[in-house]
């Protein structure tokens, strides 16, 4: 048996924060605002995994009201979510994701993101895809006010 999950996240870009996407620290004049490290890509993937296993969402497992998750490393949250998915009888098969950001250019960092995600999920890097897109200068994404992430994953019964 297989299950598909879909995840989404968006965070505002602000000065004075690091920009971390896919567990990679990306040089930029702004970073993402959030309770944790605000890694929108890993949050979307975490939601996709939890959703596919019918385990709710990232906010249910790692609430932004909990002090223990203040400044949390989203890679640690992804690994914990994957452990909970496995405990529920499922295993990740693949992940496909999209980052939407007008700036910075993400292509130079995609391979490192894929490697981090694959390592955290126990997958071959060939089972993880990350695409970078712009919003063609339209809307809040096009004005560089935020970065958005979308993800889908496939789980197989363990």
UniProtKB/Swiss-Prot annotation:
Function noted in UniProt: Involved in the biosynthesis of isopentenyl diphosphate (IPP) and dimethylallyl diphosphate (DMAPP), two major building blocks of isoprenoid compounds. Catalyzes the conversion of 4-diphosphocytidyl-2-C-methyl-D-erythritol 2-phosphate (CDP-ME2P) to 2-C-methyl-D-erythritol 2,4-cyclodiphosphate (ME-CPP) with a corresponding release of cytidine 5-monophosphate (CMP).
Catalysis: reaction(s): 4-CDP-2-C-methyl-D-erythritol 2-phosphate = 2-C-methyl-D-erythritol 2,4-cyclic diphosphate + CMP
UniProt keyword Lyase present: yes
Cofactor note as given: Binds 1 divalent metal cation per subunit.
Biological processes annotated in GO: isopentenyl diphosphate biosynthetic process, methylerythritol 4-phosphate pathway; terpenoid biosynthetic process
Record EC number: 4.6.1.12
Domain of life: Bacteria
Annotated residues for binding of 4-CDP-2-C-methyl-D-erythritol 2-phosphate: 9-11, 35-36, 57-59, 143
Gene that this polypeptide is encoded by: ispF
Gene Ontology terms for molecular function: 2-C-methyl-D-erythritol 2,4-cyclodiphosphate synthase activity; metal ion binding
Protein name, entry field: 2-C-methyl-D-erythritol 2,4-cyclodiphosphate synthase
């Amino acid at each position: 048996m297989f299950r598909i999950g879909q995840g989404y996240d968006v965070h505002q870009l602000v000065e004075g924060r690091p920009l971390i996407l896919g567990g990679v620290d990306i040089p930029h004049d702004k970073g993402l605002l959030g309770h944790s490290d605000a890694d929108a890509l890993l949050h979307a993937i975490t939601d996709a995994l939890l959703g596919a296993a019918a385990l709710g969402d990232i906010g249910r497992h790692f609430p932004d009201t909990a002090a223990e998750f203040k400044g949390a490393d989203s890679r640690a949250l992804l690994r914990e979510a994957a452990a909970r998915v496995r405990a529920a009888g499922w295993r990740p098969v693949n992940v496909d994701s999209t980052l939407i950001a007008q700036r910075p250019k993400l292509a130079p960092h995609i391979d490192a993101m894929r490697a981090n995600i694959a390592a955290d999920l126990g997958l071959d890097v060939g089972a993880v895809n990350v695409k970078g897109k712009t919003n063609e200068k339209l809307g809040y994404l096009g004005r560089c006010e935020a970065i958005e992430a979308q993800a889908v994953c496939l789980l197989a019964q363990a």
